[in-house]
Amino acid sequence: MLSLKEFNTFGLSAYAKRLDIAESAESLLALWQKAKSEKQPVLLLGGGSNVLFTTNFEGTVILNRIMGIQQRETDESWHLHVGAGENWHELVCHSLKNQIYGLENLALIPGCSGAAPIQNIGAYGIEFRDVCEYVDVLNLETGEQTRLSVGECQFRYRDSIFKHKYKANHSIISVGLLLKKNWQPILNYGNLTRLSKDNVTPQQIFDSVCAMRTSKLPDPAITGNAGSFFKNPIVSAEVAAKIKENYPDSPQYSYTNGMFKLAAAWLIERCNLKGYRIGGASVHLRQALVLINQENATGKDVVLLAAYIRRQVISKFGVLLEPEVRFIGSKGEIDAVECIS
């Protein structure tokens, strides 16, 4: 068995039977089909920043390391073609260095570029879908490659077609980004609201976002974590109003179809769970939405902690929290909600 500790940002001591690296679509296809021919479970892994190994993986893990950034310029926009294995934050830095703007709000989000569309990553007023032009997908059974337009990706809050139709037997091999030259700053969240829209620079937004994230979120290289563990819940206007009546300071954001988005971190914090610990896993003291590997945590420790948090939030607010992190069992991905219910 081979250790996966350095390939998951939680830093959990999980193991796999085999570990392979794919540096091209062709090698990814060959490695996947080889494992399947041997009747082994297969797990495709990027940066390992959004996964929780609940136990050892009884099969082959393939690391997607398809690299490369190509850029094309038109009169109005920049078009970037990015290999799925490229580190997301390094991509943001690359674009900024080359005076290609629009990704600054998404700085310091961990993981690889190929994972960005799966979750439709987002932060500080921007989501991946806002900068996406297309996503290239490889059918691992047939070898066929398909390019999906942004509309075909069916992006929603922390959701996409890659969690559904293109989840099994498919892999993202590259993404296409469209960044307009007529750059407009997005300053709706956090300390960004203090910046002047008239003279703010992309570098200032980048610096501010990095400062906010490092002040709240632990560095996975030092303290194991997977970033935001839970999704911000979407609730009806009736539920939101009831919470607002009892807790006037509760953060609420208008969402689509008359729904409201609540702040999961605030809900957890109001349950007095900062610092709460089960085994080696605990709730981060500065950001309640982050669960950390405090001391040799196991996947079971994290699952039990997440389940306890979910029960407390239901009891106090009547709101169900769903994990944003993918749960990996012995044969592959398992239902995270079911696991903590």
From Swiss-Prot:
Keyword Secreted appears in the UniProt entry: no
UniProt-listed GO biological process terms: cell division; cell wall organization; peptidoglycan biosynthetic process; regulation of cell shape
FAD-binding PCMH-type domain segment(s): 12-182
Names of required cofactors: FAD
Domain of life from the UniProt record: Bacteria
The entry's keywords: Cell cycle, Cell division, Cell shape, Cell wall biogenesis/degradation, Cytoplasm, FAD, Flavoprotein, NADP, Oxidoreductase, Peptidoglycan synthesis
EC number(s) stated in the UniProt entry for this protein: 1.3.1.98
Pfam families according to UniProt: FAD_binding_4, MurB_C
Keyword Cell cycle listed: yes
Active site (UniProt): R158, S228 (proton donor), E324
Pathway: Cell wall biogenesis; peptidoglycan biosynthesis
Catalysed reactions, semicolon-separated: UDP-N-acetyl-alpha-D-muramate + NADP(+) = UDP-N-acetyl-3-O-(1-carboxyvinyl)-alpha-D-glucosamine + NADPH + H(+)
Molecular-function GO term, any one: UDP-N-acetylmuramate dehydrogenase activity
Protein's cellular compartments: Cytoplasm
Gene3D superfamilies named in the record: 3.30.465.10, UDP-N-acetylenolpyruvoylglucosamine reductase, C-terminal domain, Uridine Diphospho-n-acetylenolpyruvylglucosamine Reductase, domain 2
Enzyme class (EC, first level): oxidoreductase
GO CC annotation terms, alphabetical: cytosol
InterPro entries attached to this UniProt entry: FAD-bd_PCMH, FAD-bd_PCMH-like_sf, FAD-bd_PCMH_sub1, FAD-bd_PCMH_sub2, MurB, MurB_C, MurB_C_sf, Oxid_FAD_bind_N
Record function comment: Cell wall formation.
Homology family: Belongs to the MurB family.
Matches recorded under HAMAP family: MurB (MF_00037)
Annotated protein name in UniProt: UDP-N-acetylenolpyruvoylglucosamine reductase
Organism: Photorhabdus laumondii subsp. laumondii (strain DSM 15139 / CIP 105565 / TT01)
